[in-house]
Amino acid sequence: MSTRLSKLFVRTLREDPVDAEVASHRLLVRAGYIRRQAPGIFAWLPLGLRVKNKVEAIVREEMERIGAQEVHFPALLPAEPYQATGRYDEYGPGMFRLEDRKRAPMVLAPTHEEFFALLVKDLYSSYKDLPLSIYQIQDKYRDEARPRAGILRGREFTMKDAYSFDHTDAGLAVSYQAQRDAYERIFQRLGLEYVIVAADAGAMGGSKSEEFLHPTPIGEDTFVRSPGGYAANVEAFTTLVPESIPIEGQPAARVFDSPDTPTIQTLVDLANAREPREDGRAWTAADTLKNIVLALTHLDGTRELVVVGIPGDRDIDLKRAEVAFFPAEVEAANDGDLAKNPGLVKGYIGPWSPEGPVLGSTSSTKVRYVVDPRVVDGSSWITGANVAGKHVLSLVAGRDFTPDGVVEAADVRDGDPAPDGSGPISTARGTEIGHVFELGRKYAEALGLKVLDENGKLVTVTMGSYGIGITRNLALVAEATQDGRGLLWPASISPFDVHVVMTGKDPAVGTAAEELVDALDAAGLDVLFDDRPKVSPGVKFGDAELIGVPTVVIVGRGAVDGMAELWDRRTNERTPVALADVAGALTAAR
């Protein structure tokens, strides 16, 4: 099949879009694949749809290979099933909510777990109907606070979501592994590097969750790896907890004057100058307990202050804090929050003062106090004394203060020990390209999805959920393969097999180009033919680079002698070839 560029609905651009942050966004717009309609919302043009359809075709082939069957749900759905599982509230402002003319609450679906479960409940009633895997490729909607990077993080996006249904946990494990293996094949066919990491389940819930992350410097996620094979999203990383320390015999806590210590380092310097350690070792930032006040907004709209104690050489990671306090929204407390709690002395906050406990549910402030896992019983700290200009030395956990709980909210760094003992971790950036969940019985229980088992007993079905971002994967392939001059698609999803560029005004050249296109078409190749008569060769070559078909055939003056040029966009090499041999050479290379 051939497509004439003179007839194709496309307009390439010389200038970058002003809001483009990453190469894929810039080039997909300039090459005429997508056009912005609103923040995070894009129209798909013919070139873009060709690539998108090929990504979807790969996904469909791999789903069919494992026996998953395709269905299709509406994007506009009633809110009630989401309310039944609690996700209507858990999604918070990220869910598009609306009402119909009868004032019934509706949503634009972010995911479809509830409705897949209800469909199976409506149709199946016996274990003999299971296992079942069904999927759809559907547009999803999430009201992102900050849409960015073009189609990498938009408010409308296309996703493949699959769901498995089993009546035993062993069956779920088999279904989960089949989907996991299919995902690996999909990403290999797309040519995307990936790392499988342990992940937090978030609003989805469930007993097991793994992400497929594509390592990229533009990634929004941080993940960690160890030499021994441990891998996790930083949000799911768990700190290796040190052993408790004997409390008996430790020095008593003592308050010391510490004016003009606006930073941890100035506090450490002052402590070393005025209060040297008895063991001769210098105080370090890791000996201090930094107490950070966070404001949590709960689902019912109430606002709660929580103080998190972390070692002073660490910082709060708000993404990890959001996981720790899910489903509440988390932000740093402001001066107004502190003003309402005069017991919290800014710059000198700590769990204890000379008057007694300050933080914790049983303290004078009643402010919840949670700590990093490294704050074990017997650990001794320098921290605030809740009096302006004063800190306390040798404040011992389990003796002088008892936190309300432990949370993973501190940042994770290169060299931290992996929790499984497999060595020091290294951190990297990545973007999620797929996510698989063992949901267990969360949704089935909430929605009453049961079947009769082998003994005639009603049992709750166990589910798995498996998502791949179609449009996100397309953008990441574009990002990973572009060469600075333009897009450079892998053959598996290129919009065309070959791009024929005709140059010159000689009628013989035009005839030769037409005959070549016919021969390529007859050979089963999908051809983009740049037949534009009044466009210069330089513009045509620039557009060929932008559009990104990996193989270009240039038909120019040499055509009168039966010759053309093969331009390999991957290597940028041009090779003379007889026109009569072009079709054979390209079909042999497929």
Curated annotation (Swiss-Prot):
Listed EC numbers: 6.1.1.15
Record gene name: proS
GO molecular function, one term: proline-tRNA ligase activity
Domain of life of the organism encoding this protein: Bacteria
Protein name, as recorded: Proline--tRNA ligase
First-tier enzyme category under EC: ligase
Record GO biological process: prolyl-tRNA aminoacylation
Keyword Nucleus: no
